[in-house]
Amino acid sequence: MSQESETSASMQPVTKRAAVAIIIDGDKFLSIKRSRTVRAPGKICFPGGGVEPGETVEQALVREMQEELGIAVRPIRFVWRSNSVRGFELNWWTAEIEDGEVITPDNNEVESFKWRTQSEVVSDPELLDSNADFFAAINRGEFEV
């Protein structure tokens, strides 16, 4: 099965890589509401961000979780790759929060966070398109988390 997808037919060329963290507790996914000062303000999505020069995707995932949520995570498994309409190659990884870590969002990047079931996430009208595409790919059986 394919682990790659395009999120729009009218996409820009891929110019930058990004890491997306899929963090699950039971049947709930960790989702964030993006702050009003970042790209796609107020949108609901999984945490993540750009890969810096010299970083691997896994290193970027760890760094972004520390920056956005103040937590140490352990990348577990690459599950999917997609391309955003803004020209990002999105690398979707499952990850686990290290024991004893407490989520403390950086309000400059994250307005709030919430643990939600898949149906709660996909029914949110503010869901970022790339996250809707992620759940659609799961429902098509392209991969499992």
Identify the role of each PLM range.
Residues 4-30, 50:
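Conserved N-terminal beta-strand and adjoining loop/helix that marks the start
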Residues 82-103, 112-120, 134-140:
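Active-site-adjacent beta-strand/loop module that shapes the phosphate/pyrophosphate-binding cleft
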Residues 24-29, 37, 52-53, 86, ...:
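Short, charged/polar surface micro-motifs in flexible loops or helix N-caps
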Residues 49, 63, 76, 116-119:
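Structural detector for helix-capping/boundary residues
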Residues 28-67:
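Conserved Nudix-box catalytic region and its N-terminal flanking loop in Nudix hydrolases
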Residues 71-81:
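A short coil-to-beta-strand element that immediately follows conserved catalytic motifs
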